[in-house]
Amino acid sequence: MVGLRTLSVLLITMFMLAPMSGCLDNEDEKPPGFQWPDRAETGCLGEDVNASCEVYLDGFTTPTNSLHHPTKNEVWISDLDGRIVAWDGGQQRLVANISNLISNCHTEAGLLGFSFATDFANASQVLFTYIGKANCETKEVTNLYLASGDVVNGTVAENSVRVLREIEQPYRNHNGGHLLALGDHTYLWGVGDGGGSNDPQGHGQNETSPLGTIQHFHYHNGTIAPLHNTTGTDQDYTLHRGLRNPWKFDVDAQNRLWIADVGQQCFEEVSMVPVLQASNFGWSEREGNREFTDPSDCTKPASEPPAEMTDPVLIYEHENGRCSITGGLFMDWGPEAWQGGYLYGDFCTGEIWRTTEGADGSYDGELLIDTETMLVGFGKGLDGELLLFTWTGTVYSLDTSGV
């Protein structure tokens, strides 16, 4: 008898190999590029898993982020379709809807991230990142935007949204978009390499391009400014580069930045550096801890990176149905057995790991639990629950007290 876990992997593998609605255009990914599966939920946990999983909230297209409100006892959860919903434990309400401003023409487009302004108690502002409106009947490619909006009477007025930065996109995929507030009016913004297979325009190693980077900026009173004033150009926004699609990242109590960077054909990556130590993570000269070639050669031996590049601290291969990393929270909360490492998972298999550091300073991934979901991210619930964001639009809370 085929178990749910086996069936899930088989179905996803079939989806990835066959044409389907929602797959990437050939102009975005060359075969055998990743093919998005249909949104068909298979459940949260398989059999014989010593944990419980409950629906926390549903009705989303694809939930992307959750943040605790700075001044109210509620959590805000963003949706790829352009909405943000607030949850106070008893009532769910719509607090933002910028769907008229965004594009959902591609499976990786939409409202990608948001953050409360670090001085929210005084400014009552929210920052957004999104892909701009496009004509889905054409192959129109629209740009990546960073914007702010005013919160008035608990909701964001669409007419208050102001564009702060615009980054030109050559393709529709690899948009990144995560926003992380560092405090004192400073933020990190993840930007993908612009899409297409194999970084066709070489953005990852182009020092003048904002694509394939993590941007670092100051925002206060409606004004944005770079924090690395070395060239007098937009290059001064770039802190880290050489990334393919830094979908999620987090900072731990030691001010180390943990990045889940989605791989090409062979390896998924977790990178870690001091948050303000400008770094080049090697894409597209390297994938994982190897030189990158087009077409990809997953059998190449590992090699030392050039002196100016930083390899990931942890990689995993595309095997046993694994396909795409999703991060990621550094766990200094939650179940004791899950603390002390960066939490990450795989979109296709639903497996969840935690980074562990060995005595020699190397890092490995400890498999914590095997879910049945198509994971797109993690969050923290109103009462400290570990939330799982899924491709199918459901937010689950995972009780791991028995793990």
Residues covered by each model-derived region:
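Conserved blade-ending motifs and adjacent loop-strand segments that build the rim/top face
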Residues: 362-382
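Short, conserved, GDST-rich strand-edge loop motifs in beta-rich repeat architectures
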Residues: 132-139, 189-208, 267-271
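Repeat-solenoid scaffold signature
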Residues: 235-274
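Acidic, Gly/Ser/Thr-rich repeat motifs that build Ca2+-stabilized beta-propeller blades
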Residues: 30-193, 248, 256-263, 321-359, ...
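Secretory targeting signatures
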Residues: 1-35, 403
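Short loop/turn segments immediately following beta-strands, especially the blade-tip
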Residues: 147-156, 217-225, 273-281, 355-361, ...
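Blade/loop signatures of beta-propeller domains
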Residues: 28-52, 154-157, 223-231, 293-309
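Beta-propeller fold detector
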Residues: 54-55, 92-99, 156-165, 225-233, ...
